[in-house]
Amino acid sequence: MKRFNLAFLLILFFINTAHPAKVDTLSVYSTSMDKEIKSVIVKPESYKGDKSLPVLYLLHGYSDSYNGWIKKTTSLKELADIHEMFIVCPDGGFDSWYWDSPIDPSYQYETFISEELIKWIDNNYNTIASREGRAVTGLSMGGHGGLYLGFRNQDVFGACGSMSGGVDIRPFPNNWGMKKYIGEQSENPDNWNNYTVMGMLHLLKPGDLSIIIDCGKDDFFYEVNEALHRELLYRNIPHDYIIRPGVHNWDYWANAIKFQLLFFNEFFTSHNQ
């Protein structure tokens, strides 16, 4: 794991306390789901439309919505300004897990985020419209989504991450609405293997994707994150792995997002010179 300099962090986060970044609320039509879906985009103060900026797609957790990150944390505007990037928070449904459901055609959130929303954002803002200018991460259900979408769409995203992510769904067959969209585990074991992050590791090659994983040691998802970390090490897949004291709550995520943005900023800077 890379060690971030605490003094550097303190300098960054006290540089700007005015939060001049702007927030737009968007409504984007999804052809795959035949409905309008809301998102918010945080635009850094420096954005005037004349410079292409990278984009972080930031996913919410189970039972939340597109404005959860904006309402429940206070640092997104400041982080967008410091790192000069767009932050897009799409609505991922109450319990979509960011899949294209093989059972319910009204839940096609992988297609919406990795294709439809990205196309709309690139057409309406001056973005770095390539994998070198895109990253995806999230918390809990969105942590699963960040890695799931990143692993499966490496032509779209160059970096991905997870905070307190449900990175292996198989130990939780009766939780968080998952069986509505991939079927009962006992009847559809292949779906449960194929729609979990742990089932996507064969898609990875060393160095092709920048990956960051963060989980609190007292989180109920800690063990599945540890298992993912061990498997990535076994496969020789480089990744940053952060374990700190903490549980599954907004206090943890409000801190974790700062480390994630540093990681993604380093990726964007090194790939867009």
Predicted regions, residues:
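Sec-dependent N-terminal signal peptides
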Residues: 4-15
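Non-catalytic cap/lid and distal C-terminal segments of serine-dependent acyl enzymes
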Residues: 20-273
